[in-house]
From Swiss-Prot:
Name under which the protein is recorded: Outer membrane protein A
InterPro entries per the UniProt record, alphabetical: Bact_OuterMem_StrucFunc (IPR050330), OMP/PagP_b-brl (IPR011250), OMP_bac (IPR006664), OmpA (IPR002368), OmpA-like (IPR006665), OMPA-like_CS (IPR006690), OmpA-like_sf (IPR036737), OmpA-like_TM_dom (IPR000498)
Oligomeric and partner information: Monomer and homodimer.
Family: Belongs to the outer membrane OOP (TC 1.B.6) superfamily. OmpA family.
Gene Ontology molecular functions: porin activity
Sequence repeats mapped onto the chain: 205-206, 207-208, 209-210
UniProt remark on domains: The extracellular loops are most variable in sequence, and in some bacteria confer sensitivity to phage and/or colicins.
Pfam family, one: OmpA
GO CC field: cell outer membrane; pore complex
Gene3D superfamilies: 2.40.160.20, OmpA-like domain (3.30.1330.60)
Organism annotation: Shigella flexneri
UniProt keyword terms in alphabetical order: Cell outer membrane, Conjugation, Disulfide bond, Host-virus interaction, Ion transport, Membrane, Porin, Repeat, Signal, Transmembrane, Transmembrane beta strand, Transport
Residues carrying the site annotation Part of salt bridge gating mechanism: 73, 163
Region (Hinge-like): 201-210
């Protein structure tokens, strides 16, 4: 019968629905089980009646999961009441116990484990019988026996799991005290509830690095100033008003604005350097008056450096024509350097 019970357990395990069983590390669980309890090698005093070795077994257990492979369980088992009848003796035997085992598991899939439990059971066995002549007999015994179990465990949800298990307990009782020393096999179906299995905190992607922006604006000096002057014209103020609205839209979180003034090559280097500085400062002063913080903006005169006309005006000799040809060199460049946060949309 023992071999038959083991074979049935293995066969049923083969049909277990594939699904993650081990609880999270360092968490507790509790459960209950119900199944077929079968006594073996009962060894009663010779009797000519039946011994009902197959009974209903049940139990409750609690455990602590150390990691996906190792846990510890403590539980109570009711192994069933076994009646026996005959001309020589009529009575019943029952056994129950508290067990402590180490549970060793291995994940087959995310939701399915196979496992074994190894440990011991502190049991109590009771017998009560009527013997020929009308006398009665009643006694009990206690002891410790090894426990071996194997099974599969399937996680229905992160909190709830079910298990199919076959458990073997050896030598429950003392034949000299209660008349028998049987072994017990318990094939059971159990369900457990795991604590602390809530969803893991979502992984938050690191914030994207701030985006460094640099914007360049170029304004013609002939629009901003009269020739050879550094005072803004009304048309120049209007142009700077439009520029200021663009700077406001850029809205750097932190950064700076640099105003670069350029002249053409007419006149001495020193004069052109001074004129470019005064023009750049005029633009800075106006933008500060519009609202740009004074500590975020600066002026720099570049004189006649970096001409954009190149040598296109080299053959122009008439002064008026040369002034007109060199107009692109007379300019104000505004460079805005800032850091603008990158806004990311949350994922649905």
């Amino acid at each position: 019968m023992k071999k038959t019970a083991i074979a049935i357990a293995v066969a049923l395990a083969g049909f277990a629905t594939v699904a993650q069983a081990a609880p999270k590390d360092n968490t507790w669980y509790t459960g209950a089980k119900l199944g077929w309890s079968q006594y073996h090698d009962t060894g009663f005093i010779p009797n000519n009646g039946p011994t009902h070795e197959n009974q209903l077994g049940a139990g409750a257990f609690g455990g602590y999961q150390v990691n996906p492979y190792v846990g510890f369980e403590m539980g109570y088992d009711w192994l069933g009441r076994m009646p026996y009848k005959g001309d020589n003796i009529n009575g019943a035997y029952k056994a129950q116990g508290v067990q402590l085992t180490a549970k060793l598991g291995y994940p087959i899939t995310d939701d399915l484990d196979i496992y074994t439990r190894l440990g011991g059971m502190v049991w109590r066995a009771d017998t009560k019988a009527n013997v020929p002549g009308g006398a009665s007999f009643k006694d009990h015994d206690t002891g410790v026996s090894p426990v071996f179990a194997g099974g599969v465990e399937y996680a229905i949800t992160p909190e709830i799991a079910t298990r199919l298990e076959y458990q073997w307990t050896n030598n429950i009782g003392d034949a000299n005290t209660i008349g028998t020393r049987p072994d017990n096999g318990l094939l059971s179906l159990g369900v457990s509830y795991r604590f602390g299995q809530g969803e893991a905190a979502p992984v938050v992607a690191p914030a994207p690095a701030p985006e460094v922006q640099t914007k360049h604006f170029t304004l013609k000096s002939d629009v901003l100033f009269n020739f050879n002057k550094a005072t803004l014209k009304p048309e120049g103020q209007a142009a700077l008003d439009q520029l200021y609205s663009q700077l406001s839209n850029l809205d750097p979180k932190d950064g700076s604005v640099v105003v670069l003034g350029y002249t053409d090559r007419i006149g001495s280097d020193a004069y052109n350097q001074g004129l470019s500085e005064r023009r750049a400062q005029s633009v800075v002063d106006y933008l500060i008056s519009k609202g740009i913080p004074a500590d975020k903006i600066s002026a720099r005169g570049m004189g006649e450096s970096n001409p954009v006309t190149g040598n296109t005006c080299d053959n122009v000799k008439q002064r008026a024509a040369l002034i007109d040809c060199l107009a692109p060199d007379r300019r104000v460049e505004i460079e805005v350097k800032g850091i603008k946060d990158v806004v990311t949309q949350p994922q649905a």
